[in-house]
């Protein structure tokens, strides 16, 4: 089971900058995917757009840590997969509402930043802190290195929400599963 530890942080220039660059990368990649779709009616998947960004030495892509840039491109990929799934449902008459291609983010806006486990400092986690790569922000946490999944920075109007996602084994689920395994044999006999 996944849980989230949330922290609210006041506005800072560092967080403003990384979320603004995230928005720029998202819009740049979205432009390339949309243009390709309009010209060929085919989809540029995550691997293709990632290769284009690397080969063109895109400034928006390289202005963020590589793993963060990849997560933003994966987010765009999920948005387009959802768009195409809706188109397929509409063709099968399972969806009757209008479908719109993913839109650009506001020019002056900010975008979510996802930092995977690999981009979080391991030495700080052992000390009970989350240190975001390329940022000087340290956040106290109870999450351990083995449980950590990712950290998300969500921009809001006058603050940021930092969500630390971690995995926990649900003891109740584990207990029920062990009961089911033991009772499976008895259930089969009762059904016969």
Predicted regions and their residues:
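Nucleic-acid substrate recognition interfaces
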Residues: 1-192
